[in-house]
Swiss-Prot record:
The gene is Nlrp1b. Expressed in macrophages. It comes from Mus musculus (Mouse). ATP binds at G132, A133, A134, G135, I136, G137, K138, S139. This is NACHT, LRR and PYD domains-containing protein 1b allele 4. Residues 126-435 form the NACHT domain. Keywords: ATP-binding, Cytoplasm, Leucine-rich repeat, Nucleotide-binding, Repeat. Probable inactive allele of Nlrp1b, which lacks a CARD domain, suggesting that it is not able to form an inflammasome. Contrary to Nlrp1b allele 1, allele 4 is not activated by B.anthracis lethal toxin and no other activation signal is reported. SUPFAM superfamilies: P-loop containing nucleoside triphosphate hydrolases (SSF52540), RNI-like (SSF52047). LRR repeats lie at residues 627-647, 684-704.
């Protein structure tokens, strides 16, 4: 802690050993970039070699060297999601899919807004919890807050004193007084303790890694007011501070993994939750320039990673980005050709081991290191003494090697050792589980012990969220086993690894919807057989039976999943392809409704911006679609480059997508050349939906060129014809005549309506009218219109009688079944008949019945008039998506109001 010092510039220092690089990404890059465009051109022309001789380079900077003039600039683009506190803390961690539309998760904020008014309450929070996945950058953010305050750029008016504590170091202390705690949070004593405590509302305590120690932060005695000099157990002192027994006016900033939130939220008063989402956009590239002091090396490394969408997505996690840079730098120093084909974090860690640890240490010393890591994970320890290292059999030579390579690091404030990152410790712990289990003398008992230890450490509900478990899945995959056998010169029996995986799967919480954590584990494993088997077994918890699918009004065939990051998007789309009961994938920004209303599908929601990188990884995974047949991107505004990438995917031989929805995506005539290239290729696409886009005559003519190609497989094309010229419509009609398999439609697609209890009784009618008006009311004469009824003789035009009354008339020419896709109405008639259809307001009738007290309006009201006896059946449309999956068709009533005022409800 320091008190309002003047701004001062800091110096850049080089780490003592080549691998001891701070994972913090906060130092200003003191590098001139004026030659970068030239270097990029040289790289593209092959003028700069990719094979490197060993060179001495400056190592990645410690956090202390951050230059203040660029500090806030680092914060500006850091993706932070401020969240609403969940009503049910039990379910706050699990990101599982469900049958209802998920509630909005919050909104994006800047670092300056951490202590601003909270969502909903509009009150400034005293407690802010920074949460996020392992290695996502929470500690870095916490250090940056302290540093920015010190440099006078952040919260200077808000706080007079800021204290930073590493909880892993605090855990080494048994007892502390408040005065001693504050002294530990100061780099240099700046004021007497009485003066500091005189204004508690000006104090900020930053507790980094509050979840790491095995603490129970309970306020032991809320009524007890201790003197600042009285010593007590550290966890009791922190519990009293957080419980507001001590310094109730003080402010707190906590960092924790998302999976640990459950044990904090119920006991903490009104916390503001902020999730760190990792690197975004330009930050990936910036990190490479911060890591590599040599500009040429930075450009070469980044361009190699940028060409691999999977590797680039993995770099969204700062810790993984460090891992990638470290591997590439090792290859440069060893004079190797740059090559990094890893598809998972586990594979990257194995690559890191092979490049970092000398062969002579792998068999014995690395095993000892793994045992040390595992013991620490089970006992919630991240700091180790020299005696701990000796106890595991680590000799001085090995420890020196691990320090030099950066696997271990020595704490400057003590004689303790730690792994370079907690994730790295968890990786070594996972290796320890497998190496121990591979010993024949242990057998099933050892396997049971390992799984029970994992459950005890992480809990059943969060088992798949634990990095150690994810690493286990990765190491037990085919590539993981191959890598371990090569590294440790051992053989891992196939039966053993399969048994361990199924033990873990069997110990997870039963009858729970599948969560993103499980998908992460399956992604790390990459075993096609396991993926197919597990995703098939999820049928009972995900997919309803055939009867439910038939009742599309209930939307039980739709599963919703929120993906906030590109990493989550990559994992979800990769795994969903192996789920044979989902045929369509839909990506929605916020709560924009899609248009694929019938096929069983998975809807991915995203409250955070969808970037070019997001689209790239989505389309990359769809190159091999397996079970997926449809893709619905309706409602998302698509840039030209995005559609270009999509079309490249559709032309890929492994892509088997048959149906594509691009309704209301902001497409213009410029995009049609891209779509035409897909139609001209031998693609699997058979249905294309392009309504509510401004394609124009020129755009549709380009589509016609693609449709004329003999290899075009398209059979259904949906367009808006009302804005097209008669000449273009004639071209479309000619195409249909020449190709009997081609069916061109111009229909209005109704949105689903989500009823709420406070919905006005005429709201649905208003919405229904507005949606119809978007398509235009003027009937078309060619190819059918939004208002046509389709029957035995083809389309039958609908006549607008009275626009004010919303009264329409249709003359059905003969007996048969007639269906209007626009409204959803369906008539069965015995003879030629004229039918009048009027859209009415529910208030005209509901006010006279008790129904308005017990039921909600969930669909439109029609006044249908026809000659008696001519109409034998009327099928009404449904426009409802239920929030509660427990509802059934018995909860619905179709009400008929007869001429004399009576009603019939069933």
């Amino acid at each position: 802690m320091e008190e309002s010092p003047p701004k001062q510039k800091s110096n850049t220092k080089v780490a003592q050993h080549e691998g001891q690089q701070d994972l913090n990404t906060t130092r200003h890059m003191n590098v001139e970039l004026k030659h970068r465009p030239k270097l990029e051109r040289h790289l593209k022309l092959g003028m700069i070699p990719v094979v490197y001789m060993k060179q001495r380079e400056e190592i990645l900077y410690p956090a202390q060297s951050l230059k203040e003039e660029n500090l806030i600039q680092n914060f500006t683009s850091l993706p932070l999601l401020q969240k609403l506190c969940p009503k049910d803390p039990e379910n706050m961690v699990r990101k599982s899919w469900a049958s209802c539309i998920p509630e909005e998760g919050g909104h994006m904020i800047n670092i300056q807004d951490l202590f601003g008014p909270n969502i909903g309450t509009q009150k400034e929070p005293q407690l802010v919890i920074i949460e996020g996945a392992a290695g996502i950058g929470k500690s870095t953010l916490a250090r940056l807050v302290k540093r920015a305050w010190k440099e006078g750029q952040l919260y200077r008016d808000h706080f007079q004193h800021v204290f930073f504590f590493s909880c892993r170091e605090l855990a080494q202390c048994k007892k502390l007084s408040l005065a001693e705690l504050i002294a530990q949070g100061q780099e240099v004593p700046t004021a007497p303790i009485n003066q500091i405590l005189s204004h508690p509302e000006k104090l900020l305590f930053i507790l980094d890694g509050i979840d790491e120690p095995a603490w129970v932060l309970a306020d032991q005695n809320p009524e007890l007011c201790l003197h600042w000099s009285q010593r007590q157990p550290v966890h009791t002192l922190l519990g009293s501070l957080l419980g507001k027994s001590i310094l109730p006016e003080a402010f707190f900033l906590l960092t924790t993994r998302t999976t640990a939130l459950q044990k904090f939220i119920p006991s903490l008063p009104m916390p503001c939750q902020v999730e760190v989402l990792g690197f975004s956009g330009i930050e990936w590239e910036n990190y490479f320039y911060k890591y590599f002091a040599n500009q040429r090396h930075a450009i070469t490394a980044f361009m190699m990673v940028e060409s691999n969408p999977v590797l680039l997505t993995l770099c969204e996690v700062p810790w993984v980005c460090w891992l990638v840079c470290t591997c590439l730098k090792k290859q440069m120093k060893q004079g190797r050709v740059l090559s990094l084909k890893s598809q998972t974090t586990t594979a990257l860690c194995l690559k890191y081991l092979s490049l970092t640890i000398p062969d002579k240490h792998r068999r014995t010393q690395v095993k000892a290191l793994c045992s040390l890591a595992a013991e620490g994970i089970w006992k919630r320890r991240t700091l180790f003494s020299e005696s701990d290292l000796c106890k595991q059999g680590l000799d001085e030579d090995a420890v020196a090697t691990f320090l030099k390579t950066g696997v271990l690091q020595k704490q400057a404030s003590s004689l303790s050792y730690s792994f370079a990152h907690l994730c790295l410790q968890e990786f070594f712990a996972a290796i320890s589980c497998i190496l121990e289990d591979s010993e024949e003398r242990h057998g099933n008992m050892e396997m049971d012990r390992i799984v029970e230890t994992l459950v005890e450490r992480y809990g059943r509900q969060n088992l798949f969220e634990a990095p150690t478990v994810r690493f286990l899945f990765g190491l037990l995959g085919k590539e993981g086993v191959k890598g371990m056998e090569k590294l440790f010169s051992c053989s891992l029996p196939g039966k053993t690894k399969l048994k361990l995986l199924w033990h873990i799967l069997g110990k997870s919480q039963p009858h729970q919807p599948p969560c993103l954590g499980l998908l992460h584990c399956l992604y790390e494993n990459q075993d096609m057989e396991l993926l197919t088997h597990v995703m098939h077994d999820l049928q009972g918890t995900i997919v309803p039976g055939p009867n439910d699918i038939a009742h599309t009004v209930l939307q039980t065939n739709v599963k919703q999943l929120v993906v906030q990051t590109d990493m989550e998007l990559m994992v979800a789309t990769f795994c969903i392809q192996f789920y044979c009961h989902v045929r369509t994938l839909q990506l929605n920004m916020e709560k924009q409704q899609g248009y694929a209303l019938t096929s069983p599908r998975m809807v991915l929601y995203r409250w955070t911006p969808i970037t070019n990188a997001s689209w790239e990884i989505l389309f990359y995974n769809l190159k091999f679609t397996r079970n997926l047949e449809g893709l619905d991107l309706s409602g998302n505004s698509l840039r030209y480059s995005v559609v270009q990438s999509l079309c490249n995917t559709l032309r890929y031989p492994g892509c088997q997508l048959k149906t594509l929805w691009l309704v209301k995506c902001g497409l213009t005539s410029r995009y049609c050349s891209l779509l035409a290239s897909v139609l001209s290729a031998h693609s699997s696409l058979t249905e294309l939906y392009l309504q509510l886009n401004d394609l124009g005559d020129d755009g549709v003519r380009m589509l016609c060129e693609g449709l004329r190609n003999p290899v075009c497989n398209l059979s259904i094309l949906w367009l808006d014809l009302s804005s097209l010229s008669a000449q273009v419509i004639t071209e479309l009609r000619t195409l249909e005549e020449k190709n009997p398999k081609l069916y061109i439609r111009s229909i209005w697609m109704p949105h689903m309506m989500v009823p709420t209890e406070n919905m006005d009784e005429e709201a649905i009618l208003t919405t229904f009218k507005q949606q119809r008006q978007e398509s235009g009311d003027k009937p078309m004469e060619i190819l059918g219109t939004e208002e046509d009824f389709w029957g035995p003789t083809g389309p039958v035009a609908t006549e607008l009688v009275d626009r004010v009354r919303n009264l329409y008339r249709v003359q059905l020419p003969m007996a048969g079944s007639y269906h209007c896709p626009s409204t959803g109405l369906h008539f069965v008639v015995t003879r030629a008949v004229t039918i009048e259809i009027e859209f009415c307001a529910w208030s005209q009738f509901l006010d006279k019945t008790p129904l308005q007290q017990s039921h909600m309006v969930v669909g439109p009201l029609f006044d249908i008039k026809a000659e008696q006896g001519a109409v034998t059946a009327v099928y009404l449309p449904h426009f409802v998506s239920l929030k509660d999956t427990e509802a059934s068709t018995f909860d619905f009533k179709v009400t008929h109001f007869q001429e004399h005022g009576s009603r019939n409800a069933r």
